[in-house]
UniProtKB/Swiss-Prot annotation:
Biotechnology: applications noted: Possible candidate for an effective malaria vaccine as determined by epitope response in sera.
Bias type Polar residues, positions: 375-394
Compositional bias (Basic and acidic residues): 46-93, 708-777, 1554-1566
Biased composition (Low complexity): 996-1028, 1102-1140, 1257-1271
Protein's name according to its UniProt entry: Uncharacterized protein PFD1115c
Coiled coil: 23-52, 1338-1362, 1444-1469, 1553-1601
GO cellular component, one term: membrane
Organism: Plasmodium falciparum (isolate 3D7)
Length: 1612
């Protein structure tokens, strides 16, 4: 700045001199005339002035021109001051200059006489040269000042105070950061002092020559030198790394001065710490970039590998001393070999680092050594540093040199030097000398692990010691990110991933909330590396140990919960991060981990992805505030009642549609258009654009007026109604009077409008022409008076248009905004009226002429409004349809079989919505896509399950333009339709309409298809009760169109539960959701029917062959009828089946007197079913209509979804489908064995994934076996064997079934590379496989009755396991003869024998499965892995480990449950005055653990895995525990007394019926928690009488079966 000031002064002086020169030139001409007169007077003055001028002129070259000019000015002023007292200062200045130049010229004039030429000539040259220099300097200064002003322009800022405050804050932050760097740099002294103190203490105390390592206290100094100074890094490698980073950053940027400073510091690394007043990030080598961090990590890896490859190490092992020894050895090797240092090529190639010796060998400069000597006395004897190769072990002579150059020698030397300072005595020196004689320690894995654990712990402590000294949050975040990057590079082989997660957890607690997004961004960048290292640790280091896998996963879950809390606390909440963290869990954790199965699945975390949707709405729509009307609030409150929503919508459309369309919707629609098209423009730009559009529209309307006038005249002539016209003429006269009054008001407006509107000036020319025409009209008034009668007739034709006119005029007067479009028309009309005021007699004629003009204008206006109203009506109706669609998607359970007609309403609403979407213009969509704000906002609605946000008009207008949202919405509708189709059985696979639609082009194959349908109906695997109303085949894959991947239609359940006309059973899962009391009645009906069916099934096999023959004869007769009349009406089929069913039941009742009551109930139900079938005749038309609607609905949806090119929605499809399936499994309170998993295949658009099909129903319940065998059957039937007899067909079927069963597990092989969604799908498969494998284990091994009574075991297996043989016997009695039945029974016996022979295989599987499930339940109980983590000490053997594993479940968990009981007792005792908040009952963790412990002790492990949870009510569980312990004790007492003596006399049928009754009573107790004890006491009396006939093993006495408890209770 000083230089600038000096240059500015010089510039001023130069400018003054130039001005003086110009003035002097003008004066010269005047002075030449008076030369002779001035000679004598001024000769004396010339010599004096010359001397002064020469002196001043010489000084100007060295000094500033300002001072010289001032001196001359002062001297001249002083001399002339006495002469000219009264004159001004400026005149004196001019005169002095004139005198000076006059003297010069007089002197030159006299040169000829005196001979003083050379001196004056030289003086003139100097003057000219000075002028040239002045000009150059002036130009240079001018350029410099222009550059300065261009670079440092001052901004016109109104709020200077705010800028000053922000500048002050920035300065404070910079000062804080600088102080933090100073603290970090000055921390070296602290680490060195601690190292000296600890080393002296340890060396003097531990004198014993044992093989134990002393704790190393030199890590802090070592880490400081490495991480902050970079002492041990190679110079060339570091320079090359910094160059790479600068190349990446400065590809397009120019090098600035700061960057030059950085390059200089990178060249002189050793001199960084000597810089003063530059405590920046360049002092810390961690912040040099990722390449320098990679060098640091490579050095640490090399050092740890070298320690591992050593043979021996001293007991007093210090890393600093070890590094110094390595460097001394490398120096000697360098002298011998004299190798040149290699150039660092790639820091990421770790293989080359092991091969090249000097790649990691670090040679320091002499400057570094001097610095270390001055700073650290430890490095007084140190020289240049190098590293050692890991691959080459040390030879024997070098080991001897190592033992001679032990670290103790160095320590003794240092102690002798610092004896006076530290106060060391001779005794201490003797002790340290004795330590030299200690034995060396051989390195083992155990010792190396200790060194490595100490390394990790010291590294962690070093990190946090540095972080404690930091106060600025930015710098703290930067340290955390860099340190976590270093730990990530060192994992999993050098830093254990458990320790890494612990470090990350500590970082997560420390990091500030505002900067949490940067920390998560680090994981987003390094996601793949983190997952790879996690899996490498899992497979290579742990070797897939289930206990350790669960514990590590639990810690990772804890870390992610910490981050999620920080995200929720942040004001600028971004739910994308929480969604990312949950997906990272789903990819890291294995499929079998409990945290992945339970809560951290992607299924339950999609709402985190769009949690800030409301915030976005409030931010983006500041002008249009989101305010919910009463209509919207009513919809939100009544969203579950579809009928109420329908009535509200109808009421709104009928009553408030006009108000809404005219007032609210027009404003909102215009605002939405403008916001979408011009988002960034202000209010002014929007107003201007509206005006431009209005003027364009007015120009177009004038051209169309003539055409519309002609059309109106024609319509007027056609609509001549004389009676009505006379009445309307009277009304027109009244209206004309009103119009005259309005003209007066309009005249005033015209005067104002002429001043305002600039565009009317252009139209004055047109108005003048019209005025000329008006003058002609005045002359023709007399002629027109005679023709008034003709005009009145014409007016009557236009009365229909006048009615529209009056309505529009009222709107024009009230709404000035609408008049802006038509101001030009009104002004023209006003001019007509102003000229005709005087002629009152001729007013009628003028009015009639004016009416024609106005009607033409108004008709155009009404047409425009009609178009706008059309748009608003469509938008409004589409909004109403959108609400109904959203309600339909959110709660599909509303629609039942009684309310199927509501599907038509949904379809109509879909049509209106789709038509509105297709009618939107492409330009608006493109403009909308360009706006990033709205796109970011709309992403919030893709997976959002909440409706409250969607029920708003403003948001609806935005969502309509987004294709992603529409894709999601239409796919959700498709899923709901298929869901309802599965449940309500609307569209079945082979209806006549579908066959016709699919086989239009295949007329030749119709007969073959009919035959195949008949054959398939003969070979159905369902019971006789499962016959359809429509007579269709049931087991073919659902294929209707080539897009069959989306159309998963109904395949009737192959279970024994559904009956023909039982509406309660069809819709019990839907009605069960309504009320809990209604659930009980449903369960009673279900279980009565199950008990009756089980009795029928048991009697069917034990009876004689007479019943079977009767059944076969009756069914053969029926099947002959069905073969002939396959495509007939449904009523005949129903009647025939029902009558035959009656006869069969009567035959069974004659043989079995025990089951009379049950069979009577069934007959009573079947008579009701027949009546219900007759009632179905009235509803048959409705069903056909709904079928057509469903097919068209699904086709339109699929056509829309196929229009999208992007395949990103495949992930979304899997999520949505799985959500509805799991929703049904978990929410439906239904104790049946129905197969709810639908065989659903996804369409793969990507070419790489064409062959993949995600099947959910590969391994569900046993019903899938029937599905798969049925597909087998159909494949065989479609071959050339269709001409064979029915008997041969049956034989092939049975052979296929028996051979097919063992091949089922082959389909469950999982691929290696699975997506997170595919892992979610596989969870269900894994747990269902466990259930399947455990059923035969219990049936064959647990019950003693089975081993004794083999004949009765068959029936038990057939009922419990639902074997295929029973289904075949009951369903295919149409064709089976006695001989064939014998063959079937032989196959059944073989199957049962095979299951009994395969007990060893089941036992082997169970041993593994048992361990698998135990590990899952362990993590349920305590995620910290308190009891089940094994000790790491070497003393434990494998046998002890196995024993401890067994004790975990049996002893420790039960003891833990007893402790929980005691805590509840303490809470409930009135003596102990404990507040409710402090009670352990209210702790959610306590509730969770108690429920899981309860399940482990009292309920079987393997029945809970899939979808059966328990309550967390502590008091309820406590009462159940007490009652169950009493029951167990009573059972033991009964068994010990030997009450049960005759095991063979037990009836299996009675046994089953009693168990079903128990289940009914216990399942009724789900909602009655208060009366649990009373109901269980009543249960005891019944169980004591019933359980006398039961014998079980002692293990089952401890663990009760799940039938004794209500299982389907959901967690609160």
């Amino acid at each position: 700045m000083n230089l600038l000031r000096k240059k500015v002064k010089n510039e001023k002086s130069l400018s003054t001199l130039l001005i003086n020169e110009e003035e002097n030139k003008n004066i010269e001409m005047t002075t030449l005339k008076d030369k002779k007169e001035m000679k004598n007077e001024n000769l004396s003055k010339i010599n004096v002035k010359k001397e002064n001028h020469d002196k001043n002129h010489d000084k100007n070259h060295d000094k500033n021109h300002d001072k010289n000019h001032d001196k001359n000015h002062d001297k001249n002023h002083d001399k002339n001051h006495d002469k000219n007292h009264d004159k001004n200062h400026d005149k004196n200045h001019v005169k002095n200059n004139v005198e000076y130049y006059n003297d010069v010229f007089t002197h030159l004039y006299n040169c000829d006489d005196g001979g003083e030429e050379p001196k004056e000539y030289s003086h003139k040259k100097k003057q000219v040269n000075n002028k040239k220099k002045w000009k150059k300097q002036y130009k240079a200064v001018k350029l410099y000042m222009n550059m300065f002003l261009n670079n440092y322009k001052l901004k016109k800022g109104k709020g200077n105070c705010k800028n000053l405050s922000s500048v002050k804050k920035r300065r404070k932050k910079k000062k804080i950061i600088q102080n933090d760097y100073i603290r970090i740099i000055n921390a070296e002294k602290e680490y060195v002092q601690k190292y000296h103190e600890d080393k002296i203490f340890l060396d003097n105390i531990k004198n014993v020559s044992s093989c134990e390592l002393i704790k190393d206290c030199s890590y802090s100094v070592f880490f400081y030198n490495l991480f902050i100074k970079g002492l041990y890094l190679n110079k060339q490698n570091l320079e090359h790394a910094t160059e790479k980073e600068h190349i990446q950053k400065n590809i397009t940027k120019n090098i600035t001065k700061n960057e030059l400073h950085i390059n200089k510091t990178s060249e002189h690394v050793s001199n960084i710490t000597k810089l003063k007043k530059n405590y920046n990030k360049h002092n810390v080598i961690l912040f040099k970039g990722k390449y320098t961090r990679q060098l640091i990590c490579d050095y640490l890896k090399f050092l740890l590998n070298s320690i591992q490859n050593e043979h021996t190490i001293k007991a007093h092992f210090y890393i600093l001393d070890y590094v110094n020894d390595l460097e001394n050895k490398k120096k000697e090797m360098a002298k011998k070999i004299k190798m040149e240092s290699f150039i660092f090529t790639n820091s990421n190639e770790e293989d080359k680092l092991c091969k090249d010796i000097i790649l990691n060998c670090n040679i320091l400069n002499e400057q570094k050594e001097d610095d270390n000597k001055s700073d650290n006395p430890l490095y007084s004897n140190n020289n240049t540093l190098k590293e050692q190769n890991t691959s080459t072990p040390l030879p024997s002579h070098e080991i001897q040199t190592e033992s001679m150059n032990s670290p103790n020698l160095l320590n003794v030397k240092n102690m002798n030097q610092t004896k006076d300072d530290n106060g060391c005595t001779k005794e201490e020196i003797i002790k340290s000398n004795n330590l030299m004689k200690t034995y060396d320690i051989k390195i083992n894995e155990h010792i190396y692990n200790k060194i490595l654990n100490n390394f990790i712990s010291e590294l962690k402590s070093f990190f946090f010691s540095i972080l404690e000294k930091i106060r600025s949050s930015k710098l703290l975040l930067r340290f955390i990110v860099t340190l976590s990057e270093i730990c990530l590079i060192l994992t999993p082989h050098y830093v254990n991933i458990i320790n890494f997660i612990e470090i990350l957890c500590d970082f997560g607690h420390i990091i500030p909330i505002h900067y949490i997004s940067h920390f998560i961004h680090f994981f987003q960048c390094n996601k793949n590396i983190f997952i790879q290292k996690y899996k490498e640790f899992q497979h290579c280091i742990i070797n897939n140990d289930p206990i350790k896998i669960q514990s590590v996963g639990a810690r990772l879950i804890g870390f992610i919960k910490i981050l999620q809390k920080k995200i929720h606390l942040n004001n600028n909440e971004q739910s994308m991060y929480s969604f990312f963290l949950n997906l990272l869990l789903s990819e890291c954790l294995p499929i079998n981990h409990l945290g992945f199965c339970n809560r951290q699945s992607a299924k339950n975390n999609f709402h985190y992805f769009f949690q800030e949707s409301l915030d976005c709405c409030y931010k983006k729509f500041k002008e249009e505030q989101i305010l919910y009307d009463n209509f919207e609030l009513n919809i939100q409150n009544n969203i579950k009642n579809y009928k109420k929503i329908k009535t509200i919508i109808e009421h709104e459309i009928e009553l408030n549609s006009d108000k809404y369309l005219i007032k609210e919707e027009d404003e909102n629609f215009i605002s939405a258009k403008n916001v979408i098209s011009d988002e960034q423009d202000g209010e002014d730009t929007l107003y201007k654009k509206r005006k431009r559009e209005e003027f364009k529209e007015t120009s177009l309307t004038k051209k169309k007026q003539k055409k519309k006038n002609d059309e109106i005249k024609k319509t007027g002539e056609e609509k001549k109604k004389t009676g009505e016209e006379k009445k309307k003429t009277g009304e027109e006269k009244k209206k004309t009077g009103e119009e005259k009054k309005k003209t007066g008001e309009e005249k005033k407006k015209t005067g104002e409008e002429k001043k305002k509107t600039g565009e009317e000036k252009k139209k004055t020319g047109e108005e003048k022409k019209k005025t000329g025409e008006e003058k002609k009209l005045t002359n023709d008034v007399t002629h027109l008076t005679n023709d008034v009668t003709h005009l009145t007739n014409d007016v009557t034709h236009l009365t229909n248009d006048v009615t529209h006119l009056t309505n529009d005029v009222t709107h024009l007067t009230n709404d000035v905004t609408h008049l802006t479009n038509d101001v030009t028309h009104l002004t023209n009309d006003v001019t007509h009226l102003t000229n005709d005021v005087t002629h009152l007699t001729n007013d009628v004629t003028h009015l009639t002429n004016d009416v024609t003009h106005l009607t033409n204008d108004v008709t155009h206006l009404t047409n425009e409004k009609y178009i706008e109203e059309k748009d608003t009506k469509e938008m409004y109706l589409s909004y109403m349809s959108f609400i109904s669609l959203v309600a339909f998607i959110k709660y599909p359970e509303i629609i039942t079989q009684d309310n199927i007609i509501l599907v038509e309403d949904v379809y109509n609403s879909f049509k209106t919505f789709l038509n509105y979407i297709n009618s939107l213009e492409k330009e608006k969509k493109e403009n909308f896509k360009r706006t990033k704000k709205y796109m970011n906002m709309i992403k919030a609605y893709l997976f959002n399950d909440h409706i409250d946000i969607l029920a708003n008009v403003h948001i609806f207008k935005v969502l309509v333009y987004d294709e992603n949202f529409l894709r999601v919405l239409f796919f959700n509708i498709l899923v709901v339709l298929n869901y309802l189709n599965r449940e309500l059985q609307i569209c079945v696979k082979d209806d006549n309409e579908l066959d016709n639609n699919n086989n239009k082009n295949n007329n030749n194959n119709k007969n073959n298809n009919n035959n195949k349908n008949n054959n398939n109906n003969n070979n159905n695997n369902n019971n006789n009760n499962n016959n359809n109303d429509n007579g269709v085949k049931k087991n073919d894959p659902a294929i209707i169109s080539p897009r069959s991947s989306f159309l998963f239609f109904v395949e009737y359940d192959k279970n024994d539960d559904h009956e023909l006309g039982d509406p309660e059973k069809i819709n019990n899962h839907l009605n069960g959701l309504m009320t809990r009391g209604h659930q009980k009645s449903i369960r009673e009906n279900i279980k009565n029917k199950e008990s009756g069916k089980s009795s029928i099934l048991t009697t069917g096999t034990s009876n004689n062959n007479n019943n079977v023959n009767n059944m076969n004869n009756n069914m053969n007769n029926n099947m002959n009828n069905n073969m002939n009349n396959h495509m007939n009406s449904n009523n005949n089929v129903v009647d025939s089946n029902s009558t035959n069913f009656k006869e069969n039941v009567k035959n069974k009742d004659n043989s079995n007197n025990r089951n009379m009551s049950v069979n009577q109930n069934i007959l009573h139900n079947k008579t009701k079913d027949i009546k219900f079938c007759k009632e179905n005749d009235d509803k048959f038309v409705i069903k056909e209509k709904i079928k057509k609607i469903m097919f068209t609905f699904v086709k339109e949806l699929l056509n829309y979804l196929d229009g999208f090119i992007n395949s990103n929605h495949n992930f979304m499809l899997a999520k949505e489908y799985s959500w509805y399936v799991w929703k049904k499994q978990l929410n439906v309170a239904k104790y049946n064995k129905d197969d709810y998993d639908i065989s659903f295949k996804f369409k793969c658009i990507d070419e790489n994934i064409k062959e993949q099909n995600y099947d959910i129903n590969q391994t569900t319940n046993n019903n899938t076996y029937n599905n798969q065998t049925s597909n087998h059957m159909n494949e065989n039937l479609h071959t050339d064997e269709s001409s064979k007899s029915n008997n041969n067909q049956d034989k092939t079927v049975y052979t296929n079934e028996v051979s097919y069963l063992p091949n089922i597990p082959k389909k469950n092989k999982k691929t290696d590379n699975q997506s997170p969604v595919q892992t979610l799908i596989n969870i269900i498969q894994n747990f269902e496989l466990l259930n399947k494998k455990m059923k035969p284990f219990y049936c064959n091994n647990k019950n003693k009755n089975k081993n004794k009574n083999k004949n009765k075991n068959k029936n038990m297996e057939q009922i419990n396991n639902k074997d295929i043989t029973m289904n075949l016997c009951n369903n295919n009695n149409n064709i089976i003869h006695n001989k064939e039945q014998d063959n079937i029974q032989q196959h059944d016996d073989n199957n049962i024998i095979n299951t009994n022979n395969d007990q060893s295989s089941y036992n082997n599987d169970i041993f593994h499965i048992n361990n698998f499930l135990l590990e899952i339940n362990k993590i349920y109980l305590r995620r910290e892995a308190e009891f089940w983590e094994l000790d790491e000490s070497d003393s434990l053997t494998d046998e002890k480990k196995n024993d401890s594993n067994k004790k975990i479940l049996i002893e420790k968990l039960i003891d833990k449950l007893d402790d929980y009981k005691k805590k509840i007792n303490i809470d409930n005792d009135p003596i102990n005055e404990i507040e409710e908040n402090e009670k352990s009952k209210n702790n959610p963790v306590f509730k969770f653990r108690l429920s899981k412990l309860f399940i482990l002790k009292y309920i079987d492990l393997y029945t809970i895995v899939k979808n059966k949870e328990f309550t967390t009510d502590c008091d309820f569980l406590y009462n159940l525990m007490i009652q169950m312990d009493k029951n167990v004790e009573k059972k033991k007492s009964l068994l010990n007394k030997g009450v049960v003596e005759n095991d063979e006399d037990i009836n299996v049928e009675h046994h089953i019926n009693m168990e079903d009754e128990k289940n009914e009573k216990l399942n009724d107790k789900e909602g009655e928690y208060e009366d649990v004890t009373e109901n269980l006491n009543e249960q005891e009396a019944e169980e004591e009488a019933e359980e006398e006939a039961e014998e079980e093993e002692e293990e089952e006495d401890k663990f009760l079966t799940p039938e004794h408890l209500p299982i389907n209770v959901e967690i609160k």
